[in-house]
């Protein structure tokens, strides 16, 4: 390949990289449309519309799920929304009206973590195209509870220690004064001054200890039915209560109360370098060079903090829950084993 083609290829590569960078940084829709990477729906003659959830028709509390909308035009060509659908249709050209679930500007649905907000309801979305009242897609979204839920009430991690300050470099010694080497008038050059020592680096600070995991209390009641559900409320001092609905046939709830990790010790500062000795002055004889100063010692690294202690977990459950206790799991490592208390528990909401 001759030099001319090499230069041309470089220009093309640089231009393509610059365009890609501009699109990545600005997300410029106009550029994407100009390049044919996106299409405005108003420029198409579409006849059908359909909505779907590629990750499955149902959602669990706390889950997100991308929405995909598909169109067919008069020629039979299929057009799909951007994002999860990897298509060209812009979400900004559509109106998505959600119920129970929420939706963001990229067509991603979300069901609230708190099951009380969706209890006894199904999610619903309606997709319409402004200016085209004949195009409408509706989608019902059942709520599922047969998934692994988890809640962590762990202690806070310790703070990291401060790094030590670096030592100061020593100053260089002064050069010796000049003598002379003239016949009958020789004089010795002066000795160079010694460099000063570098100072020691500061010690790193110790890392803070991790916080203890709090004592956790779990209340569990049974909601009877053709497919029984476990109502659970998990609480800890100073923490917001967490609510769960769990289908024990496939679902589970894991409760964690571990101590926070200790913070890392700070690094010791580097010792300062000794100053160089000054040069001996010229003369007959020349002066001696000064001695270089000693380097300072590096500071000691700080000690890591200790991990916090793991919290206790107490599970209070209604007698009707006992056959389903295998769906309740705990993790508090070396802390005492969870305490189980069987006593009547009324419906929790």
Regions found by a protein language model. Name each.
Residues 2-17:
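Bacterial N-terminal signal peptides that target proteins for export
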Residues 29-66, 74, 138-158:
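Short S/T/G/P-enriched beta-strand
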Residues 49-50, 99-103:
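Small-residue (G/S/T/A) turn/hinge positions that recur once per unit in extracellular repeat modules
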Residues 63-78, 218-222:
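Beta-strand-rich structural segments
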Residues 72-100, 231, 249-251:
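Short flexible loop/turn segments that cap and initiate beta-strands
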Residues 103-118:
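Extracellular/luminal low-complexity segments enriched in Ser/Thr/Pro
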Residues 119-132:
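Short, aromatic- and glycine-rich surface loops/edge beta-strands on solvent-exposed regions
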Residues 146-214, 227-314, 318-349:
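Glycine-centered low-complexity coil/loop motifs and glycine-rich tracts
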């Amino acid at each position: 390949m001759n030099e001319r083609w090499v230069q041309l290829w470089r220009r093309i590569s640089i231009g393509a990289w610059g365009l890609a960078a501009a699109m990545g940084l600005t997300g410029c829709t106009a550029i994407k449309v100009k390049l044919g990477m996106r299409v405005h729906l108003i420029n198409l003659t579409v006849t059908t519309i359909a909505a779907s959830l590629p990750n499955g028709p149902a959602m669990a509390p706390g889950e997100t799920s991308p929405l995909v909308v598909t169109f067919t035009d008069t020629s039979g060509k299929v057009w799909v929304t951007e994002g999860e659908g990897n298509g060209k249709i812009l979400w900004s050209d559509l109106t998505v009206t959600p119920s129970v679930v929420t939706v963001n500007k990229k067509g991603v649905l979300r069901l609230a973590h708190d099951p009380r907000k969706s209890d006894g309801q199904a999610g619903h979305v309606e997709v319409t195209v402004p200016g085209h009242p004949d195009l409408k897609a509706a989608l019902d979204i059942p709520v599922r509870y047969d998934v692994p839920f988890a809640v962590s009430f762990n202690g806070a991690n310790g703070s990291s220690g401060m790094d030590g300050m670096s030592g100061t470099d020593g100053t260089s010694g002064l050069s010796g004064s000049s003598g002379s080497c003239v016949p009958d008038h020789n004089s010795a050059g002066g000795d160079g001054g010694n460099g000063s020592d570098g100072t020691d680096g500061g010690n790193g600070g110790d890392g803070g200890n991790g916080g203890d995991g709090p004592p956790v209390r779990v209340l569990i009641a049974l909601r009877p039915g053709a497919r029984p559900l476990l109502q659970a409320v998990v609480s800890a001092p100073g923490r917001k209560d967490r609510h769960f609905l769990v289908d024990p046939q496939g679902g589970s709830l894991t409760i964690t109360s571990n101590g926070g990790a200790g913070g890392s010790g700070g690094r010791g500062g580097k010792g300062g370098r000794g100053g160089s000795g000054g040069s001996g002055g010229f003369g007959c004889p020349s002066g001696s060079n000064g001695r270089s100063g000693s380097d300072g010692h590096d500071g000691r690294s700080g000690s890591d903090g200790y991990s916090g202690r793991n919290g206790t977990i107490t599970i209070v459950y209604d007698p009707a829950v006992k056959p389903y206790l295998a769906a309740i799991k705990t993790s508090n490592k070396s802390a005492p084993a969870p305490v189980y208390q069987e006593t009547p528990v009324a419906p929790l909401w």
